[in-house]
Every structure is written in C-alpha cells, then in structure tokens.
C-alpha cells in the first residue's frame, strides 16, 4: 500500500540491490603491473589517493554539518537536512527508532484520538496547533450499513499530512495517508513544482483537493473555515479532466495485463503530465466548464460607504 512518484526510488532500493548483488562477484581483469608504465602507475596511484582524500574530507564535513542552521530549526539554502537530529529534537528521543517513539512527534497522538472519535470516517487535516486535527466528516453511511465484530463502524479515514512514515506506522493499513507534496499522493505529485522549493518538497497541493476527491461532506458547516466551498466544487469538477483520470487510473485501477502494457507505453507521457494546483486554473487548462458558484462573486457593487 505504497504509492507516489517520489517513493518509488526508496521502495525499489531493496530489489535493486538484490539484482545487482550477483554482478558484484564477477571478477574484473586488471592489467598486469609489468604491462603498465611506471609513469602511468604513479599517475593512477596519485589520482586514486586524491579521490580518496576528497571523499574523506566530504564525509567529515557532512558528518559535522547540522544542515538546519546552528539551532536545527530551519532548512538552509542547501536544502540538506540532518534528519536524525531533526526528529530527535522533535520527538524528545535521542534515537527514535520505533513507531512508539514517534508518537511524541507533534500531532501524532492526537491523530489516533481523532480516528477513534470518528467511527463513520473522516478526512483529518492538520490544525494550527499541535494537539488537534481539523475533521471533515465522511458522508454518513446508510442506517443498515454493516458494523464490525465489536459493533463499531469502520468508516473511510484519510489523513492529509507531510510526514508519512511515522503516520502510516501508527494509524495502520486501513487508514489512507496522503500528503500535499507528492511523496505518496499521485495527484499532488503531478502538480507543477514550486520554483526554488526544497527538492522533494517543492509541491504543495491545497487541502480542498483532498476533500473533493474523497467520500467526504463538501459544504459548510462541515468543512473548516479556511477551505472554500467553491474551490472544492471546482476541484471536484477538475478531477473529471480525461487526461487526469488516465494518470490517476494508471496507479489506482486494478492491475491487469492491459493496464501494465498501457502504463508501460504511456510512462513518459504520464510522468511529464502536470496539473495546476489552483482548481479554477486547472479547469481552464483542461477546457472544462466552471461549476455554478455557491457564493456569488464579490464585485464591489452596489457601492457602499459615505
């Protein structure tokens, strides 16, 4: 249950290593010393020594560079971060290794409480403070909907948050975890990158899209005040763009021989495909009609005032 363009590289590391391991035992033929001129040998040894010293120097610099400024509180211009130091500081654990260690990260315990308190399902959005989540309720199930063995319902839950690893390990496999920067969210991954943004974190999908694409209530008073009902309706309409549907079906539809061949044939096109993260602009890009607005646009008329 993993997805997103950015994550494929991490997920493929283990099988790639297994594929390359047999190649590592194939012997390489090295020229005999007698066949190498003395001057060439000196040059070869010197170049190897310089390269080794350069790697050692770089390693020493990297090991002693905090990467987030002297107080480890901000991402510097390099975009390189000492992740261990960051999470040690954020969780209060010198060596955070287990899922339980990351429950002390801001919002982590609160997300478990929010899921327990919404048995019919909900979309959870990170609130401005660190111990609560904003809840968008799921569309209520019918009265005769089946319940679990303990009599409780297990509605659709989606959590919209950046830190996927600690979240996924603690909420379990029945909770959908997506992010706004495209690490494991195909929709966010296909938005245009923000210029000069931190690499791998240079996209930012508005939460209105998460409401639009899920089985959640999409109107007031069920949505947080910082979301716009018209934006949600526009995002919902924009998801009907045929090209966007094709890209999303490539990763969401059931795998079959036909789907596999289609993904292979369209891989380059799907990878290049980008949407606009502003729903109104995305509708214009795709040539789709604008939904009827819920709230009439403000025009400043009639004029009021002295």
Predicted regions and their residues:
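Hydrophobic/aromatic-rich transmembrane helices and adjacent perimembrane loops
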Residues: 4-39
